[in-house]
C-alpha cells in the first residue's frame, strides 16, 4: 500500500497561501485515494474495473479535493514567479511529488509473475517449442494407453514393456516443457545473462533419462540372449544392481503373441517418427538443445516400437524369438550413444566451454562483425579498417554471448581514435548482430592499439595500467566505455 508521511504533507502545505487543517485533511485524503488506485492498477490490472467502481462513489467529494490541490499548486506557482525565495519552497513540493513517484515505482517492481508450466492458449501458440512439446506429451499419453490396452488384449509382453517406457517419457516431456518455457524469460538485474542455463540443465536431465532407458533395454536384451548359458541365479543377482527389466524379454519368449498387435506397433512408429521430425525442426529453428534431446527421445520410442514389431512378426511367422533380443541390443547402443552425447554437450555448456571456430554459429557471428567494422573505415581517415584479434562465443541454452577484441589502427594524421568513434563502432556491431543473428544476447567488445603484439599484452595491460587499451561492455540496456 502506498503511504506518504504526515510530516511530508505538512511541509507541502506550510508554504501554500490559504492552507489550513481542513485543507490538510482533504489533501491527505485525496492523495491516499489516488495513490491507492494507482498502486492497484500497477499491481493487478484486472481488478481496476472493480476498484474504479468503488472509488466512483466518492468521486464528487474527492474531485473537490483534487481541485483544491490543483488550486493550491497554481497559487504556489504564481507566488514563486513573484518571489525567488518561494522557489525554494516549491522545491519542497516537488520533493514530495518525487517521493510519491519513487514509492509507486518501488511497489510496482515486486509484482512480476513467475510462470512455470502454463496451459495458456496464447503461450502455446506463441512459443513453438512449448507447442511441439505439448503435442509430444499428448502423443506419449495416447501411445502409453494404446500399448497397454493392446498388450493385454493381444498378449504382447513387448507392447506392455513399451507402454511402461512411454509413461517414463512423460517425465522427459515435463522437464523439456519446464526448461523451454523458463529459459525464454527475459534477463533481469539478478540474472543479467538470462535463464538459458536452465534449458542446459533440462537437456542434461533429458539426456540422462535417455541413456538410462538405453541401458535398461540393453540389459533386458542381454539377459535374454545369455540366459541359456549363464546360470539364472547369477543373472538375478546382477539384475538386482540395475533393475529387474529382463523379465519382459524372458516372458516374451514364453507367451504367444496375437499378430494383430503389429498394427499398434506400426501406428506407434508412424506417430513417433512424425513427432521426431517436427520436434527436430523446431529445435533447429530455435537453437534449443533440450528440444533436440527430446526429439531424439521420440526417435528412440519409434525404434523400440520397431523392435516390438519385429518381435511380434518373427515370433508369429518364423517362431524366432531371438531377433527381438538382437534388435534390442542394437537399439540400446544407439540410445546410449545419443544420450551420452547429450550429457557431454550439456556438461561442456554448463562449464562455459567456448564454441570452436569451426562451428557454423562462430563463423556466422565472425562474418557479421567483420562486415560491420569494414563499413566503419570510411567514417574516419583510417589507414586500415578495424581488425578482429580475438572472438569468444559462449552458449547459454538457445542464446549466445559474444566477446571480441578489436585492433584499432591510427589515423593518417597520426592522431588517436576518439571515444565517440569507439562507441559508434560497438553500437554498429551490436545492431548488426541482433539483426542478423537473433539469438545473440550480451556482447562485450575490447579495443586495443594496433601496436600491441599479442593477446597476452592485452591481459597484462589490466595490471600495468596501459594507456592504449579501451574496454567496452554492450548489452540490451546500454554501452559503457572505459579507456585506460
Swiss-Prot record:
Membrane-topology annotation of the record: Multi-pass membrane protein
One Gene Ontology term, aspect cellular component: membrane
Keywords, ordered alphabetically: Ion transport, Iron, Iron storage, Iron transport, Membrane, Mitochondrion, Transit peptide, Transmembrane, Transmembrane helix, Transport
One Pfam short name: Cation_efflux
GO MF entries: monoatomic cation transmembrane transporter activity
Polar residues: compositionally biased ranges: 73-82
Transit peptide, residue positions per record: 1-56
Subcellular location: Mitochondrion membrane
Biased composition annotated in UniProt, kind: Basic and acidic residues: 83-92
Gene3D superfamilies named among the record's database cross-references: Cation efflux protein transmembrane domain (1.20.1510.10)
Transmembrane segments: 132-152, 158-178, 209-229, 256-276, 316-336
Main location: mitochondrion
One example of a Gene Ontology biological process annotation: intracellular iron ion homeostasis
Listed InterPro entries: Cation_efflux, Cation_efflux_TMD_sf, CDF_Transporter
Region (Disordered): 73-114, 453-484
Disulfide bonds: none
Role summary: Mitochondrial metal transporter involved in mitochondrial iron accumulation.
Family: Belongs to the cation diffusion facilitator (CDF) transporter (TC 2.A.4) family. SLC30A subfamily.
Protein name, per record: Mitochondrial metal transporter 2
Amino acid at each position: 500500500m502506498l503511504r506518504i508521511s504526515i510530516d511530508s504533507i505538512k511541509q507541502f502545505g506550510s508554504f501554500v497561501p490559504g492552507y489550513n487543517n481542513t485543507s490538510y485533511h482533504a489533501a491527505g485524503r485525496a492523495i491516499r485515494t489516488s495513490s491507492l488506485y494507482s498502486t492497484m492498477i500497477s499491481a493487478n490490472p484486472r481488478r481496476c474495473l472493480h476498484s474504479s467502481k468503488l472509488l466512483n462513489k466518492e468521486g464528487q467529494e474527492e474531485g473537490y479535493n483534487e481541485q483544491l490541490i490543483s488550486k493550491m499548486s497554481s497559487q504556489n506557482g504564481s507566488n514563486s514567479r513573484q518571489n525567488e525565495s518561494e522557489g525554494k519552497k516549491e522545491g519542497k513540493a516537488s520533493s514530495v511529488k518525487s517521493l510519491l513517484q519513487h514509492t509507486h515505482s518501488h511497489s510496482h517492481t515486486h509484482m512480476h509473475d513467475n510462470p512455470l508450466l502454463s496451459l495458456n492458449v496464447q503461450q502455446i501458440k506463441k512459443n513453438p517449442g512449448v507447442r511441439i512439446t505439448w503435442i509430444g506429451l499428448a502423443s506419449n499419453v495416447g501411445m502409453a494407453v494404446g500399448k497397454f490396452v493392446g498388450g493385454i488384449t493381444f498378449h504382447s509382453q513387448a507392447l506392455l514393456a513399451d507402454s511402461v517406457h512411454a509413461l517414463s517419457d512423460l517425465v522427459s516431456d515435463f522437464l523439456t516443457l519446464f526448461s523451454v518455457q523458463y529459459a525464454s524469460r527475459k534477463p533481469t538485474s539478478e540474472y543479467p545473462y538470462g535463464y538459458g542455463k536452465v534449458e542446459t540443465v533440462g537437456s542434461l536431465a533429458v539426456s540422462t533419462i535417455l541413456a538410462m532407458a538405453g541401458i535398461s533395454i540393453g540389459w533386458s536384451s542381454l539377459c535374454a540372449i545369455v540366459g541359456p548359458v549363464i546360470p539364472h541365479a547369477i543373472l538375478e543377482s546382477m539384475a538386482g544392481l540395475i533393475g529387474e527389466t529382463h523379465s519382459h524379454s524372458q516372458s516374451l519368449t514364453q507367451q504367444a503373441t496375437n499378430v494383430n498387435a503389429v498394427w499398434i506397433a506400426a501406428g506407434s512408429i508412424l506417430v513417433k517418427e512424425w513427432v521426431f521430425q517436427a520436434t527436430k525442426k523446431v529445435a533447429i529453428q530455435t537453437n534449443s538443445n533440450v528440444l533436440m534431446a527430446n526429439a531424439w527421445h521420440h526417435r528412440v520410442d519409434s525404434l523400440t516400437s520397431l523392435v516390438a514389431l519385429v518381435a511380434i512378426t518373427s515370433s508369429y511367422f518364423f517362431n524366432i524369438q531371438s531377433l527381438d533380443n538382437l534388435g534390442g541390443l542394437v537399439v540400446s547402443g544407439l540410445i546410449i550413444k545419443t544420450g551420452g552425447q547429450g550429457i557431454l554437450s550439456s556438461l561442456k555448456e554448463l562449464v562455459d566451454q567456448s564454441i570452436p571456430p569451426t562451428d557454423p554459429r562462430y563463423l556466422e557471428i565472425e562474418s557479421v562483425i567483420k562486415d560491420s567494422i569494414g563499413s566503419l573505415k570510411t567514417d574516419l581517415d583510417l589507414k586500415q579498417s578495424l581488425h578482429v584479434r580475438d572472438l569468444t562465443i559462449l552458449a547459454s541454452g538457445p542464446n549466445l554471448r559474444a566477446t571480441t577484441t578489436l585492433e584499432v589502427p591510427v589515423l593518417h594524421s597520426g592522431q588517436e581514435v576518439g571515444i565517440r568513434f569507439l562507441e559508434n563502432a560497438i553500437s554498429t556491431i551490436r545492431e548488426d548482430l541482433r539483426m542478423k543473428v537473433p539469438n545473440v544476447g550480451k556482447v562485450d567488445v575490447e579495443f586495443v592499439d594496433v601496436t600491441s603484439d599479442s593477446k597476452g599484452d592485452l591481459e597484462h595491460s589490466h595490471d600495468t595500467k596501459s594507456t592504449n587499451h579501451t574496454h567496452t561492455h554492450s548489452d540490451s540496456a546500454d554501452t559503457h566505455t572505459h579507456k585506460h
